[in-house]
Amino acid sequence: MTDLTPREIVSELDRFIIGQNDAKRAVAVALRNRWRRKQLADDLRDEVYPKNILMIGPTGVGKTEISRRLAKLARAPFLKVEATKFTEVGYVGRDVEQIIRDLVDNAISMTRDHMRDDVKANAHQAAEERVITAIAGEDARESTREMFRKKLKAGDLDDTVIELDVADTSSPFPMMDIPGQPGGNMGMMNLGDIFGKALGGRTTRKKMTVSQSYDILIGEEADKLLDDETVNRAAIEAVEQNGIVFLDEIDKVCAKSDTRGGDVSREGVQRDLLPLIEGTTVSTKHGPIKTDHILFIASGAFHIAKPSDLLPELQGRLPIRVELRALTEEDFVRILTETDNALTLQYTALMGTEEVTVSFTEDGIAALAKIAAEVNQSVENIGARRLYTVMERVFEELSFSAPDRAGEEIIVDAAFVDENLGALAKSTDVSRYVL
């Protein structure tokens, strides 16, 4: 669980997302409230429920990017799902309880990684012993083992090929598709789970170099030192107390006002989400999970539907509303210059692999931003994603001929942008289809 302050969370998000301060602040406060709740006494902690968030804003302004960056900051079980993937319980397709099952699976792998770090020193020692045994043999003297241990630590044996018995991770049972259940096991028991324990301990003999064997052996030895029951218990606790679910495309499950009957992949999904967001118990193969304290952040463009088209009960369960504004030309300039993952840096690095040096001038960046903003206004506003189309068009010729132009230096200024894009941008009819 992260202990960053709201100010630190916002400044971390600022590195990748331009503007949208309201959304960043709401998310930062929600994340900090998780930490605050942990500091409370047990009886009061159970009474403090998370305030779920609804982010509303046009496409391409940073809603999904906020969730992606938040996942890295949260250090808590985190899952991002699209609401459009689900159908009402009882119909073919995934039901919303699968969200919690996936969240638990994420938490278990995250908890196992953290716990592996705690036992890494002991696991490293055990892995070293297995490598020495594989090189020197089972009945080697202690002096011989010691000699090999010194060589091993010095790195002299890294390229030596050894044969080892390692755990066979392949399942002896083929995956079976259950009709009407895409993905087969849908979070419930599959044959591998049922018989895996009984047939456990299967090993396979593999040849590998000493340096390759370390990662596999350390993982195996760490797993031997970890108790599955403890890992599962810690993961379930983390999900129930600190879990965060990001529900994208929530506007796509709004029923159109003129629709007759309950649409199974729209209103039906909303009805199923109600108890999940309010707090219910979901059965998983690792045990029941209470969703009372899981934080839900929903987001949608609400391009066609309105937030008021959501079921009133669902609106009530998303009390914090945040509006994200559309991006302007100035924002595009900042996106191309200030972010840590700016497209300008990406294209410079990509062309650098072909030994072509690319540099951007201020007027070149201004021209890119101006064209992106103009096309957004005249055709369809798709936000920052328009920069991808514009940049790809500008670099189309250079990307194709880069291998033949090694050693050249390309300056992307207003003239370069105009030469590669000018005619397209001026003709609205053409830009409608091409950009």
From Swiss-Prot:
<keyword id="KW-0963">Cytoplasm</keyword>
<dbReference type="InterPro" id="IPR019489">
    <property type="entry name" value="Clp_ATPase_C"/>
</dbReference>
<comment type="similarity">
    <text>Belongs to the ClpX chaperone family. HslU subfamily.</text>
</comment>
<comment type="subunit">
    <text>A double ring-shaped homohexamer of HslV is capped on each side by a ring-shaped HslU homohexamer. The assembly of the HslU/HslV complex is dependent on binding of ATP.</text>
</comment>
<dbReference type="GO" id="GO:0005524">
    <property type="term" value="F:ATP binding"/>
</dbReference>
<dbReference type="GO" id="GO:0043335">
    <property type="term" value="P:protein unfolding"/>
</dbReference>
<feature type="binding site">
    <location>
        <position position="313"/>
    </location>
    <ligand>
        <name>ATP</name>
    </ligand>
</feature>
<dbReference type="GO" id="GO:0036402">
    <property type="term" value="F:proteasome-activating activity"/>
</dbReference>
<feature type="binding site">
    <location>
        <begin position="60"/>
        <end position="65"/>
    </location>
    <ligand>
        <name>ATP</name>
    </ligand>
</feature>
<dbReference type="InterPro" id="IPR027417">
    <property type="entry name" value="P-loop_NTPase"/>
</dbReference>
<dbReference type="InterPro" id="IPR003593">
    <property type="entry name" value="AAA+_ATPase"/>
</dbReference>
<dbReference type="Pfam" id="PF07724">
    <property type="entry name" value="AAA_2"/>
</dbReference>
<feature type="binding site">
    <location>
        <position position="385"/>
    </location>
    <ligand>
        <name>ATP</name>
    </ligand>
</feature>
<dbReference type="InterPro" id="IPR050052">
    <property type="entry name" value="ATP-dep_Clp_protease_ClpX"/>
</dbReference>
<comment type="function">
    <text>ATPase subunit of a proteasome-like degradation complex; this subunit has chaperone activity. The binding of ATP and its subsequent hydrolysis by HslU are essential for unfolding of protein substrates subsequently hydrolyzed by HslV. HslU recognizes the N-terminal part of its protein substrates and unfolds these before they are guided to HslV for hydrolysis.</text>
</comment>
<dbReference type="InterPro" id="IPR004491">
    <property type="entry name" value="HslU"/>
</dbReference>
<feature type="binding site">
    <location>
        <position position="248"/>
    </location>
    <ligand>
        <name>ATP</name>
    </ligand>
</feature>
<dbReference type="GO" id="GO:0051603">
    <property type="term" value="P:proteolysis involved in protein catabolic process"/>
</dbReference>
<feature type="binding site">
    <location>
        <position position="18"/>
    </location>
    <ligand>
        <name>ATP</name>
    </ligand>
</feature>
<dbReference type="GO" id="GO:0016887">
    <property type="term" value="F:ATP hydrolysis activity"/>
</dbReference>
<dbReference type="InterPro" id="IPR003959">
    <property type="entry name" value="ATPase_AAA_core"/>
</dbReference>
<dbReference type="Pfam" id="PF00004">
    <property type="entry name" value="AAA"/>
</dbReference>
<dbReference type="GO" id="GO:0009376">
    <property type="term" value="C:HslUV protease complex"/>
</dbReference>
<dbReference type="GO" id="GO:0008233">
    <property type="term" value="F:peptidase activity"/>
</dbReference>
<keyword id="KW-0067">ATP-binding</keyword>
<keyword id="KW-0547">Nucleotide-binding</keyword>
<keyword id="KW-0346">Stress response</keyword>
<keyword id="KW-0143">Chaperone</keyword>
<protein>
    <recommendedName>
        <fullName>ATP-dependent protease ATPase subunit HslU</fullName>
    </recommendedName>
</protein>
